[in-house]
Amino acid sequence: MVSQFPIVIEEISEDLLQVKLKENKIDYPYFFWQLSQHILKSQNNLEVVPGEDSLVIQFNPVLQDREEIKEEIYKLTESIDAPVKNKLERSITVPVCYDNEFALDMKNILNHTGLSRREVIGEHCHRKYEVKMIGFTPGFAYLGELSEKIKLPRLTNPRPFVPKGSIGIANNRTGIYPIQGPAGWSIIGRTPINLFDTKRNDPFLILPRMELIFEQITKSEFNAMLRD
């Protein structure tokens, strides 16, 4: 089988390779997501970081041959489905509570944007987002495009910890932290649903090629969903 995807593999350091596409008519994030999954399943002890327009691969230059890895990557692209650009496969609605207890940076967001609380919430949840990529932590979904009216830069001083389900905004993206951990984005709310669970057949609830809609809920609804 001959690969239908013209890729370029660049050496960016002695232990890092970067895979790029020459073709711009396909869904870049989904292509690199598929390739990363094929690489992980091949059990070749490679670390992969899929991005929106490239894939970075880390290997051990002492134990692994760079040229053999390149050849393996070319072969793996042969089994990737043709990811047509802008073709979304499924839609998911994610409930969000924007109460102060969960919206840790709402005050700063209001000051930065000059909008009212209701307007900020409306700008965030009254639109459809595309899953651009998965990364940073297991299941973290980068969603776009965020409304221009509530675009903020990343935090100058990232938080060392936010609870799982926290929803952040930064630049033209919004994202959900599926597990507790550090966060460099402004936290606008939190969802009670479990986005990453290793006990599920598919541990990730949100995947590339999905469309996502946020739905505002009250604190009592949040707590009820958390108990279910």
Enumerate the predicted regions with their spans.
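Glycine-rich active-site loops that engage anionic ligands at enzyme catalytic sites
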Residues: 2-228
